[in-house]
Amino acid sequence: MSFKNFKVVEKMIFGRGSFVQLDDVLAAQRKADDDFVVFLVDDVHQGKPLEARIPVKAQDLLIWVNVDEEPSTIQIDALTEQVQAFNGKLPVSVVGLGGGSTMDVAKAVSLMLTNPGGSAMYQGWDLIKKPAVHHIGIPTISGTGAEASRTAVLCGPVRKLGLNSDYTVFDQIIMDSELIDGVETDQWFYTGMDCYIHCVESLEGTFLNEFSKAYAEKAMDLCRQVYLEDHPEKDDKLMMASFMGGMSIAYSQVGACHAVSYGLSYILGYHHGIGNCIAFDVLEEFYPEGVAEFRLMMKKHNITLPKNICKDLPDETIAKMVAVTKSMGPLWANVYGPTWEEKVTDEMLTALFRRI
């Protein structure tokens, strides 16, 4: 039996107000006067107080990243070319400041600056051959676990799939709960539920082990304190839940919800957080206790999900979603084990999507 030898984030800073230390962290990477940093920042912060706090130097490149649509291989390739055109040398660091999508963009760009070809070539598992540029993740919304994960999820020409690699993992993260204050309620809920769903999929999966179980159980406990108890330190708790949920998946795998959500997102364009919630709400047969508790959380925060979005879609559209979802072999293996292909049929998935 072969055991995973996986990489974790090398350095991390946690605490309210810790964002102020970013300049010091970057100073350690700057060795020459012309060394530059690339800041990839969610454009929701443009013109807001956070913009003035970003430690951009004269030689640096700040790019406002729009993530209204899910990150795509086309977007990553364009951003990579923009960085290459800005300066003939490599940046000493790439900083991703935003939610999971923005952090995934930063991870992907840092990889593509050192690996030839287009990013679609590397969608899959362990296809990246060269280490990335030094890269830093700073979440301004919590839940996805992108700060801890070894993937950067992109919509490509064929499917939605991540650049899964040890080189994808951030070299440094800064977790400052001040930055997630004031996130709009629906977005706060959808993104946080990504963490909760990570935990359910990990704890109910065939890949479960004590490493994953320890992280998932604690992350789930923190999610309950945030979404059911409305704890006064909920921002700090959600930030740690997100990280620990991501760590749980590192030595396990996600499951049916993420597989179905990928099909929804790729074909219908739903963002990852809400896509997961829409999918999870119909997966009682897979995760009965998790779905029941999820609905309690929705009720407490007055969340209403879209319904019947797939009921009347053309058969060919459903077939495309089924194809994307069925292609997620490792996810279904975590649900059913090595014989998953016997159970995950086109008919089963078609019936599932028609209920959404």
Swiss-Prot record:
Misc. remarks from the entry: Kdo8N is found in lipopolysaccharides of members of the Shewanella genus.
EC number, UniProt record: 1.1.3.48
Coiled-coil region list: none
Note accompanying the cofactor annotation: Shows highest activity with Mn(2+) and Fe(2+).
UniProt keyword terms in alphabetical order: Iron, Lipopolysaccharide biosynthesis, Manganese, Metal-binding, Oxidoreductase
Disruption phenotype: A double kdnA/kdnB deletion mutant shows increased sensitivity to polymyxin B and bile salts.
UniProt keyword annotation of Zinc present: no
Protein name as catalogued: 3-deoxy-alpha-D-manno-octulosonate 8-oxidase
InterPro entries in the cross-refs: ADH_Fe/GldA, ADH_Fe_C, Alcohol_dehydrogenase_Fe
Catalytic activities: 3-deoxy-alpha-D-manno-oct-2-ulosonate + O2 = 3,8-dideoxy-8-oxo-alpha-D-manno-octulosonate + H2O2
Enzyme class, UniProt record, top EC level: oxidoreductase
Cofactor(s) required for function per UniProt: a divalent metal cation
Gene Ontology MF annotations: alcohol dehydrogenase (NAD+) activity; metal ion binding
Organism: Shewanella oneidensis (strain ATCC 700550 / JCM 31522 / CIP 106686 / LMG 19005 / NCIMB 14063 / MR-1)
Role noted for this protein: Catalyzes the first step of the biosynthesis of Kdo8N (8-amino-3,8-dideoxy-D-manno-octulosonate) from Kdo (3-deoxy-D-manno-octulosonate).
Family: Belongs to the iron-containing alcohol dehydrogenase family.
Pathway note: Bacterial outer membrane biogenesis; lipopolysaccharide biosynthesis
Keyword match Acyltransferase: no
Regulation: Inhibited by EDTA.
Domain of life: Bacteria
One Pfam family matching this protein: Fe-ADH
GO biological process: lipopolysaccharide biosynthetic process
